[in-house]
Curated annotation (Swiss-Prot):
<keyword id="KW-0694">RNA-binding</keyword>
<protein>
    <recommendedName>
        <fullName>Large ribosomal subunit protein bL20c</fullName>
    </recommendedName>
</protein>
<dbReference type="GO" id="GO:0005840">
    <property type="term" value="C:ribosome"/>
</dbReference>
<keyword id="KW-0687">Ribonucleoprotein</keyword>
<dbReference type="GO" id="GO:0006412">
    <property type="term" value="P:translation"/>
</dbReference>
<dbReference type="InterPro" id="IPR035566">
    <property type="entry name" value="Ribosomal_protein_bL20_C"/>
</dbReference>
<dbReference type="GO" id="GO:0000027">
    <property type="term" value="P:ribosomal large subunit assembly"/>
</dbReference>
<comment type="function">
    <text>Binds directly to 23S ribosomal RNA and is necessary for the in vitro assembly process of the 50S ribosomal subunit. It is not involved in the protein synthesizing functions of that subunit.</text>
</comment>
<dbReference type="GO" id="GO:0019843">
    <property type="term" value="F:rRNA binding"/>
</dbReference>
<dbReference type="Pfam" id="PF00453">
    <property type="entry name" value="Ribosomal_L20"/>
</dbReference>
<dbReference type="GO" id="GO:1990904">
    <property type="term" value="C:ribonucleoprotein complex"/>
</dbReference>
<dbReference type="GO" id="GO:0003735">
    <property type="term" value="F:structural constituent of ribosome"/>
</dbReference>
<keyword id="KW-0689">Ribosomal protein</keyword>
<dbReference type="InterPro" id="IPR005813">
    <property type="entry name" value="Ribosomal_bL20"/>
</dbReference>
<keyword id="KW-0699">rRNA-binding</keyword>
<comment type="similarity">
    <text>Belongs to the bacterial ribosomal protein bL20 family.</text>
</comment>
<dbReference type="GO" id="GO:0009507">
    <property type="term" value="C:chloroplast"/>
</dbReference>
Length: 117
């Protein structure tokens, strides 16, 4: 019986895996089994942290808006400010409001005066 040489498919798969894990430290970039485990772990972390990043930015925007509202001396809190925005049907999201709060506080002050009851 003649010897059958293995194909290139497994080698190609491992090469692709090795390129992905080349920046990992120690055995995580050298041994195939640990490379596979670390790749799965890295992709899970990336997937989880994409959602976390969205939550973190939303918290940051809310904090910035709240800080500027309290600094301006407006007599209501952040949640009442957002509630009044919705009642007056001003469609400004928190990202835009935070940018206005940082760059142009007088504009945010006029918005708050417009929606105040």
């Amino acid at each position: 019986m003649t010897r059958i040489k293995r194909g290139y498919i497994a080698r190609r798969r491992r090469t692709k895996l090795r390129l992905f894990a080349s920046s990992f430290r120690g055995a995580h970039s050298r041994l195939t089994r640990t490379m596979t485990q670390q790749r799965i772990r890295a992709l899970v972390s990336a997937h989880r942290d994409r959602g976390k990043r969205k939550r973190d930015f939303r918290r940051l925007w809310i904090t910035r808006i709240n800080a500027v509202i309290h600094e301006m001396g407006v007599f209501y809190s952040y949640n009442r400010f957002i509630h009044n925005l919705y009642k007056k049907q001003l469609l400004l999201n928190r990202k835009i409001l935070a940018q206005i709060a940082l760059l142009n506080r007088s504009c945010l002050y006029t918005i708050s005066n417009e929606i105040k009851e």
